[in-house]
Regions:
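Membrane-embedded alpha-helical bundles that constitute the cytochrome b-like, heme-associated redox core
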Residues: 1-216
Length: 216
C-alpha cells in the first residue's frame, strides 16, 4: 500500500471533523421532526452516548490499522477522534443533567446513590476530559513520561463505557454486549502493554525486600 502523504492525512482529519460535527448538526432537524422516538430527551441522550462510544472505538482502532497497514501517519487521527469523543460524551452528560434531571441537584444526588451505572459513566467522562485537556502539545511536553501513563487510561475508559451502557438498559442487553466484545477485541493486541505495570509490581516488591538490611 502506498504511504499516505500529509495531504491524505489532512483530508482524513477533515473528514473526522466534518462527520463528527455533521451528525451533531443533524439533530437540529431530527429533534423538531420527531425522529428520536416518543421520548425525545431519552432518544437524544442515547444518540449522543452511542456516538461517543463509536468515536471511542474508532480512536482505539487507529493504532492497529496504522500498524497493520504500516501507515504511521494515521496516528494523527487519534487526537481529533479522541477530542470529538470527549465532546460527544460531555453533551450526553449535559442532556441528562439539564434536560432529563433539569439541574435538580437533590434528584441528581439520589440518582448517583441508586444507579451505579451513572457513577461508572461519570468516571469515564472525567477520564475523557482529563485526556482531552492534556492532549494540548504544550502539556504533553511539560508532563513528560507522566503524559503517557495518564493517556493509557483510555483503555480503562474503553471498558467502562460499554459497561455503563449495559447497566443502563432495562432490556436489550445484546447491543451493549457487542460493544463490550468489540472493546475487548481492540484491547487484546495491547494485552502485553496493559499487563506490564502489574508484572512490574511484584518485581519491585521483591527488589525492595532484598535491599532491606538483615536484622542481627
Amino acid at each position: 500500500m502506498p504511504r499516505l502523504k500529509t495531504a491524505h492525512v489532512n483530508g482524513l482529519r477533515a473528514l473526522v471533523h466534518l462527520g463528527s460535527l455533521g451528525f451533531l448538526l443533524w439533530l437540529g432537524y431530527a429533534v423538531p421532526a420527531g425522529l428520536l422516538g416518543g421520548d425525545p430527551v431519552q432518544g437524544l441522550t442515547h444518540y449522543l452516548g452511542k456516538g461517543a462510544l463509536h468515536l471511542l472505538l474508532l480512536t482505539l482502532l487507529v493504532s492497529p490499522l496504522a500498524k497493520r497497514w504500516r501507515q504511521g501517519p494515521l496516528i494523527k487521527l487519534r487526537r481529533p477522534l479522541g477530542l470529538w469523543c470527549a465532546a460527544w460524551a460531555s453533551l450526553h452528560f449535559m442532556v441528562w443533567l439539564g434536560l432529563d434531571l433539569q439541574f435538580d441537584w437533590g434528584l441528581i444526588g439520589g440518582e448517583l446513590v441508586k444507579r451505579s451505572y451513572i457513577v461508572v459513566g461519570m468516571v469515564a467522562l472525567l477520564l475523557l476530559l482529563a485526556l482531552g485537556i492534556t492532549s494540548i502539545p504544550a502539556l504533553l511536553r511539560r508532563m513528560g513520561p507522566a503524559w503517557q501513563k495518564l493517556h493509557n487510561w483510555i483503555y480503562g475508559v474503553a471498558l467502562l463505557v460499554p459497561i455503563h451502557y449495559w447497566w443502563s438498559v432495562k432490556s436489550g442487553w445484546q447491543e451493549p454486549l457487542i460493544y463490550l466484545v468489540l472493546a475487548c477485541a481492540l484491547l487484546w493486541p495491547r494485552r502485553e502493554k496493559l499487563l506490564r505495570p502489574w508484572r512490574k509490581r511484584p518485581q519491585v516488591a521483591r527488589r525492595g525486600a532484598a535491599q532491606q538490611p538483615s536484622r542481627p
